[in-house]
Amino acid sequence: MARRPVLARHRIDFRNRVNYIGRFAPSPSGPLHAGSLVAALASWLDARAHHGLWRLRIEDVDTPRTVPGAAGVIMDQLRALHLHWDGEIMWQSRRGAAYQQAFDALAARGLIYGCGCTRREIADSALRGTADVDGERPYPGTCREGLPASRQARAWRVRVPPGVETFVDRWLGPQQQDVAAAVGDFALRRADGLWAYQLAVVVDDADQGVTDVVRGADLLGSTARQRVLGRLLGLAPPRVMHVPLIVDPATGLKLSKQNGAPALDCSQPLRMLQQAWSGLGFAPLAAATPEAFLQAAAAQWAQRFGMRHAAVPASPKAD
């Protein structure tokens, strides 16, 4: 008898589920910039090319990094760019109960343990010669068999099973990662009570019924561990596509809020959309309005990545 999925609480009516649900999930640590627009445009086009839904999720789970008012600015930018989302917005800061339920389900199976290690201790561990993944050292498993005497938990980690995780990225092709070796047991909750991004995104994608994740290539390193975590929770993984990053030609660094990327000038939406389209490797489109551009771009995207020669419907506007 097949094991029942742990998270059998989704509020989606799967009898009426569309074949494609995508999402854009910005963090409200500042306004959108040219790099984030590339990811937003790619995910929007992929949803429209598949006649699917495009959800908006505000990833404000890391509350200390949240900038007051930034979420509203992001929504205004998307509207100005004519990238209208479908349905209600999901806010991670309001979903603690959902994350707790997933955490408790894993803990009940002995898959969670407390860890008292500091970042410095992990960096100075026996694995210090191992390559970083997403800027972090792999966790060496110091507390896997129990906290050392006089130590208190600074984080709670999930026990990663052995094995190589393989998947096909729709842009980059076949990928694989030995999560246990490259990442180790990763944190799901911090000592201050904040939930980790990896747990939040897996639970949120499941609750929103997401079938396809289209995002920047800087998040490719998170995919394997998210698939592992989803499988431990009894969830089917979404398809993934990681699109190119936009690099500052002066510094060679990717455009990001941390690197001081300027906010989008949404007073010129067509120019911003054309630049993002170029960043995805497409030739310029002859279009006089943002609506005409998006219609033509979605048709080209469908030819390359979606249902060939399908009519592309106009996007419904968000409320």
UniProtKB/Swiss-Prot annotation:
Asked if the keyword Ligase belongs to this entry, the reply reads yes
Claim: RNA-binding is one of the keywords in the record: no
Query: Record's GO cellular component, any one?
Result: cytosol
Q: Required cofactors, per record?
A: Zn(2+)
Q: A GO BP term, please?
A: tRNA modification
SUPFAM superfamilies linked: Nucleotidylyl transferase
The EC number(s) attached to this protein equal: 6.1.1.-
Q: Which residues form a coiled coil?
A: none
Instruction: Give the binding site residues for ATP.
Output: 257
Annotated function: Catalyzes the tRNA-independent activation of glutamate in presence of ATP and the subsequent transfer of glutamate onto a tRNA(Asp). Glutamate is transferred on the 2-amino-5-(4,5-dihydroxy-2-cyclopenten-1-yl) moiety of the queuosine in the wobble position of the QUC anticodon.
Please give the family membership noted in the entry.
Belongs to the class-I aminoacyl-tRNA synthetase family. GluQ subfamily.
What is the protein's name according to its record? Glutamyl-Q tRNA(Asp) synthetase
